[in-house]
Amino acid sequence: MKLLQTPLYQECKELGGKMVPFANWEMPVSFSGLIEEHNAVRKNVGMFDISHMGVVQLKGKNIKSALQNLVPSDVFRIGPSEACYTVFLKENGGIQDDLIIYDQGVLDTNEESIVLVINAARKESDIEWLSSNLFKKEITISEFMPEGALIAIQGPESISTLEKILEEPLSNLPRFGHRTITSNPNLINSQESIFIARTGYTGEEGFEFLSSPETAKSIWKSLIASGVTPCGLGARDTLRLEASMHLYGNDINLDTTPFEAGLGWLVHLEMPNDFIGRKALEKQAEVGTQKKLVGIQVLDKGIARKGYPVLYNSETVGIVTSGTWSPTLQKPIALAYVPSEIAKVNTQIEVEIRRKKHPAIIVKRPFYRKGF
């Protein structure tokens, strides 16, 4: 199957992006190098082409009431121009996807609008699942700016950098706040809408914005001219792992529940509403979980990768879900599921790396978090 290309594919190639397959897309894994890109985001500012992500719009009446039956989080706690992180669940409490819900309020057409940003690999199944659960409602499901480009700009200098280019005040936009702005006429001939949110996947201050390809290309080039470092999937992974942010397919999946994954704060059982997976989660909240996701630090130079066994008292008890060398902390870190009874900080364990046992310890998560 031919891989899909984002609207910024050529721009990435021209900057030396090393392209790899990812969730049916051809995406840059790196530009100047993972360490340099990672450090740019931690210390200055970097940007990512994340146009492969799914962006879905729900329009109609009583959308929140319908959506409340599909997620375990209280969606009524957010209002227009606000957003929240949550998950879609199966009846057994397993996680179908993690996502961000953006409340756009009421449109000029008197319709309510909710925008969902979902994972690229889960886009088709999520849309099918939404359609099957909302088909009796007066709600339409469509891609939001289907031809658009999505860019993330992340790092301590992201606010000042983006404010200069967009000529738009952004420091007053709260965390998980969002709004639609009009593009700076100096960037593109015609003024166009840009959907911008103060969100990210790095543990740093940052923004994500969606616009037409033409506007995105103009902003991308202006960011490069301003000295912003282009970053690939490799740095995005090390950054999110340091911040203990979950990667779907690795750290969460259909066989893991929010309580097991350390996402219990997303589950609002105090709500009277029923939602898919509620019964399973109520039972788990009552009796506890058999496994938990923990942070691990390998105590030598061994790097634990996805699928490596975790041992306790020489017995295999778990599996690594994500692992890397942390450029910020200068040590190997990983996430893994282990039995709940040993999921305690300072528990001594081992990780089997290429048939050799390496000493490790369970540590507090996140490994690092400065901004978001």
UniProtKB/Swiss-Prot annotation:
The keyword Transferase applies. One of its GO terms (molecular function) is aminomethyltransferase activity. Pfam families: GCV_T, GCV_T_C. InterPro entries: GCS_T, GCS_T_bac, GCST_C, GCV_T_N, GcvT/YgfZ/DmdA, GcvT/YgfZ_C, TrmE/GcvT_dom1. GO terms for cellular component: cytosol; glycine cleavage complex. The keyword Secreted does not apply. It is an enzyme of class 2 (transferase). It catalyses: N(6)-[(R)-S(8)-aminomethyldihydrolipoyl]-L-lysyl-[protein] + (6S)-5,6,7,8-tetrahydrofolate = N(6)-[(R)-dihydrolipoyl]-L-lysyl-[protein] + (6R)-5,10-methylene-5,6,7,8-tetrahydrofolate + NH4(+). Keywords: Aminotransferase, Transferase. It comes from the Bacteria. GO terms for biological process: glycine decarboxylation via glycine cleavage system. Its EC number is 2.1.2.10. The glycine cleavage system catalyzes the degradation of glycine. The glycine cleavage system is composed of four proteins: P, T, L and H. Belongs to the GcvT family. This is Aminomethyltransferase. It comes from Prochlorococcus marinus (strain NATL2A). The gene is gcvT.
